[in-house]
Structures are given as C-alpha cells and as structure tokens.
Amino acid sequence: MKMKRSLQIAMFVILAFALTTSSAFAAVSKKNEKKSITLLNVSYDPTRELYVDYNAVFAKYWKKKTGQTVTVKQSHGGSGAQARSVIDGLEADVVTLALEYDVSAIEQKGLISKGWQSRLANNSAPYKSTIVFLVRKGNPKGIKDWDDLVKNDVKVITPNPKTSGGARWNYLAAWAYALKHNNNSDDKAKAFVKELFTHVPVLDTGARGSTTTFVEKGIGDVLLAWENEAFLAKKEYGDKFEIVTPSLSILAEPTVAVVTKNVQKHDTRQVATAYLDYLYTEEGQRVAARNFYRPINPKVALEYSKQFPKLNLVTIKDFGGWDKAQKTHFADGGTFDQIYLKK
C-alpha cells in the first residue's frame, strides 16, 4: 500500500512539474511574440515617401517607450479604390486616406467605430494639402490659372475621380473656380468642367499614376497635382518642372482612422491608436512638413511657413460636406458621369 501511495505521489509531482514547465514555456513564448508586432497602413497614392519616413520615426519612438518592435507595412493606391479594398477584406489596422468620405464608407460597413472623426484633433485630419499645377520647364503653354486649362492646345493630366481622392479634390477646385467666375451658376460650372475633361487624354486610377504619366512618360502639358506631389517632382527632377499656384484652390484634408474590427482581430489596438496619435506630435508634424504636407500644429507650421505659398482656398463645406459632394458629383449617375465622355 505504501509503495502504491508513493507511486501516486511521484506521478502527481511529475505531472505538476510538466504542467508548470509547459505553462512557463507558453508564457515565455507569448512574451517573445509580443516583442514584435506588425501593422498594415492602407493609404492613398502619393503618401509613400511620407509614411516610409514616418514609420521609421514612430518605430524608434515605440521601441523606446515600450520595448516592442513595430513593423508597419504600407499599401497605396487611389483613395476610393483603397477604401473598397478594405471593405472587401484587406485587413488594414489603420487607414490614412485622401478624404473623409472614403473613411466613412468603411465605417458604414461596420469596420470602423462610429464617431471616428471626433477621436482625433481637426476632425482626424493630421495634415493638410491643396491642389496646384505642375508644368514643364519654362511653362511653354503659359498656364497661369484654371481657364488656361481649356485652351485648344493644352492637354491636362488628372486621375479618375471615381477611384482617386486627389482627382475629386482637383474636380471640386475647378468647379469652385468656375462658380466664382460665373456668378455661382452651376450650369456654367458644369460646362466648364465638362470642357476641361475633353482636354484629358488619359485617366489614371490614382495620383501617383498620373504623376508618372506626366513626369516620366512625357504626356500632357499640365498636371493637376497634390501640392506635396508637385514639390516632390521638383525635388526629384530639379529644373525640369515648375509649380504654378492658381488664383483659387481647395483645402484638401486627408483623414485617418483605426479600423476597429481589424485591430480587435489582430490585437493591435494599442499600437495602432498610438501610431495615429503620434502624427499630431511635433515630431510627427515635422515629418509631414518635410514631405511637403502642410502641418496643422501652429508651431511647426510657422517653422515651415516659407515652404508653402499663401492661397485662396474653398473648403468641402462650400459643397455641403462630403456626403452631398459625393452624391452630387461622383456617385453613379452624378455630374461627373454626365459630363465625362470616355475616349
């Protein structure tokens, strides 16, 4: 009996040791797993350079703060197309898109928590931009303002408003100019924008594609461009191009959000939230400014004030907000569909 009892005790000790050891190994493994984490940032077309720069800065900050190594993967394309990709299953932890409507489209599918606009400052728009013209050296066609775009011999490069956020800003800026110079007549604005699109030889799906068409393929006389994209082209290609600032443009406000459903699935909410929060710090704002986005932090904006020209700007509010603008101009059967004649 004593031998049997001793054997039972021995078996219990061995089992307990095995369970303890297994738990310890599991804990160590789990701890090691948390030493590194990966995020996916699904963004719009011309933010590649911005987020390569920012990701390195954020990773350094996060490592120092938490000891955790964070790797941020990037996905880029036309903003509308990117929003559709997330809706269709691309598992973004964060989205950094060209405009509010595209983020709201993801929210409407239940992937982003309601009220995302108010979670961060400036309606979750951490930096600003606008639309300018990029022309070839010497400005051979003498392009100075929007009305020059409809001269007989001018070819205009702009992306497709159905897929590109930048293209929608381009379109609305042109519409605003036409309204201003035609006593706010929507009919005359529609006619002007229709005429403008007859000068567009090709519609790329995103802003970077249009830049490639203009800069590398040599197609067109003027590129309607994000301001940061125009600055970047000048930086990379020197004196081959010039930037023309039109008399009127539009305040472009790219917006950001955590994709709630995906961060819950990936267990990345904490780092994803911090990733967007850090865009608003002085360091994050300087990264944006270095990449030719207009910072919203007053101190950093002052530091870079000489970099950005002063502009007369309309805002999306002048179009009744993005829901109304999208429905009126860019939804199926909207104004763009009515005026654009496919080549």
Regions found by a protein language model. Give the residues of each.
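Bilobed "Venus flytrap"/periplasmic-binding protein-like clamshell domains
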Residues: 47-53, 162-191
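Short, low-complexity disordered leader/linker segments with a strong preference
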Residues: 1-38
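Extracellular/periplasmic juxtamembrane helices and adjacent flexible linkers that interface
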Residues: 263-343
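N-terminal segment of the mature folded domain
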Residues: 31-164, 305, 341
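Short helix-loop capping/hinge motifs at secondary-structure junctions, enriched
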Residues: 138-144, 163, 176-184, 262-270
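Ligand-binding pocket segment of bilobal, Venus flytrap-like solute-binding proteins
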Residues: 181-247
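Sec-exported extracytoplasmic/periplasmic mature domains
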Residues: 55-64, 87-91, 100, 107-111, ...
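Residues embedded in well-ordered beta-strands
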Residues: 132-134, 242, 255-257
